[in-house]
Amino acid sequence: MKPLQQIHLTCRRIIRDVLQHKSFLPAFISTSCTCLSRKKKHNGYDEVNQAKYEGLVRTVTASRISPQTPDRLFEEDNFLFGKVVKSKTATQTPEPKAPQNWVPLSNPNKVSLPLEKTDFDLPLKISLPARNHMANGTIPSVTRILQQTMPMEQAFYLERWKQRMIMELGEQGFAEYTAALFSQGKQFHMQLEDLLLALDHGKKEEPEGSTGYLSSVQHVLTDIIGVKSLESAVHHSELQYLGLVDCVAEYRQKLCVIDWKTSEKPKPYIRDTFDNPLQIAAYIGAINHDNNYNFQVNCGLIVVAYKDGSPAHTHFMDTDLCLHFWNKWLLRLEEYKKKKEEKEKQQ
């Protein structure tokens, strides 16, 4: 018999003997695997701290189903990133700031006459230039203070509107547009003054462009009586600021500072009037601390008139609401003074 055939028969005999004795098979395979494993190269996983990750390995291998349940995900996130820090909800608003130099809206030291004894032949009309001359131009106006302390968000939307209008109308067209708005507003105030004074009412020709605004406020005028002042300057003697008040009169039996506004868009809510409530509060405080006025005011009224003649929106401010906006005004006034001081230091 050839040597190759002998080797083949010998191998078959060994396999048959092994299969007949199955008890030796695991040992044979284990021994073979052990021998083979000795030939493998060094593995980097041997250096891993297995005790550190023992719990994680046990968790993954202990179950045959997927461990990615909601509870398991929360546990893993907590292990990897730590505990969740809950942010403040939208309803948690910061406490309102209090003015450092708080001055009351009303003047406790001012002796006010009853309304029936404060009637004049003509309403008060103190010119603003005379006040500026008296103060040598060093006292800021309410309008200036509000403009220079305008919130960033409000300034952003105002600038965006301006740029949009410039894109549509051009620089010159936008200038003409704003000039026309100013002219219409001025005509509207002049004719309102005539109507409130009842001078040549119904005989005077209405200026073109203002008839729509006048029609818009007709239902408001029927509730206004006892005009005390028209286009009159006010000066807060303690806080040192100036303003020009459109009107002080009784509205539904409440003495109010009345501010007439024109708008091309509806403004049904007081928040739509932006800083106008602060302006009203500033004027009320100034009147109460101005000796030229022998009365005090604690209410306000914003009237928004529309060019198309649709009924004007009225926003009445009672005493509590006036106090609310008075505090906001005091904060804006403090901000203005702080900015002014910083600017003077840099010069």
Curated annotation (Swiss-Prot):
Top-level lineage group: Eukaryota
Molecular function terms, GO-annotated: single-stranded DNA exodeoxyribonuclease activity
Gene3D superfamilies per the UniProt record, alphabetical: 3.90.320.10
Intracellular or extracellular location(s): Mitochondrion
Main location group: mitochondrion
E.C. code: 3.1.-.-
Entry keyword set: DNA damage, DNA repair, Exonuclease, Hydrolase, Mitochondrion, Nuclease
GO cellular component: mitochondrion
UniProt record, GO biological process: mitochondrial DNA repair
Membrane-spanning parts: none
Role this protein plays: Single-stranded DNA (ssDNA) metal-dependent exonuclease involved in mitochondrial genome maintenance. Has preference for 5'-3' exonuclease activity. Necessary for maintenance of proper 7S DNA levels. Probably involved in mitochondrial DNA (mtDNA) repair. Specifically binds 5-hydroxymethylcytosine (5hmC)-containing DNA in stem cells.
Family the entry assigns: Belongs to the MGME1 family.
Alphabetical list of PANTHER family matching this protein: MITOCHONDRIAL GENOME MAINTENANCE EXONUCLEASE 1
Extra information: This protein may be expected to contain an N-terminal transit peptide but none has been predicted.
Protein name as annotated: Mitochondrial genome maintenance exonuclease 1
Species lineage: Eukaryota, Metazoa, Chordata, Craniata, Vertebrata
